[in-house]
Amino acid sequence: MWKLGRGRVLLDEPPEEEDGLRGGPPPAAAAAAQAQVQGASFRGWKEVTSLFNKDDEQHLLERCKSPKSKGTNLRLKEELKAEKKSGFWDNLVLKQNIQSKKPDEIEGWEPPKLALEDISADPEDTVGGHPSWSGWEDDAKGSTKYTSLASSANSSRWSLRAAGRLVSIRRQSKGHLTDSPEEAE
């Protein structure tokens, strides 16, 4: 069994094997063991140094510097802040602040085509082939394909309507199991 101690490699032989060879380890094995020891210390140092970054180093060395270098130190800190990559939360906020393109402005995007069953289902609700919902206004471009909620007063009504629609979709998906909506609940 190999043991490490004070910069050299020692070989411990069990008592029953002491009768055979009394010499040290073979030279190839000793060289391999020394390489392992050197690699282990280097890996250990890398682990310790990976815990700290350059900002920490500047902060720790700041106390040792003379008062003359305070101005340059501030400039270095400002440069580091400018060079720093933005963090996760900064990226998240930037992505939310960027206005996304409207679907009709995306290259290669086409509006969904309604099936004939959907168009013929509610003929009294359609005006010019598009459903007319009160409380919804046209976009700034005047497009009748895309609409947005006009007033916040109607938002609760629309949220209730959307919840009701979700329930009906859920019931339809369970339709193959039950015949009536009362049995589904």
Swiss-Prot record:
GO terms for biological process: spermatogenesis. GO terms for cellular component: cytoplasm; cytosol; intracellular membrane-bounded organelle; mitochondrion; nucleus. Its main location: nucleus. The keyword Cytoplasm applies. It is found in: Nucleus; Cytoplasm. It comes from the Eukaryota. Keywords: Cytoplasm, Nucleus. Expressed in spermatogenic cells, especially in spermatocytes (at protein level). The keyword Ion transport does not apply. Residues 1-29, 121-156 are annotated as: Disordered. Contributes to normal sperm motility, but not essential for male fertility. Belongs to the TDRP family. Interacts with PRM2. This is Testis development-related protein. It comes from Homo sapiens. The lineage of its organism: Eukaryota, Metazoa, Chordata, Craniata, Vertebrata.
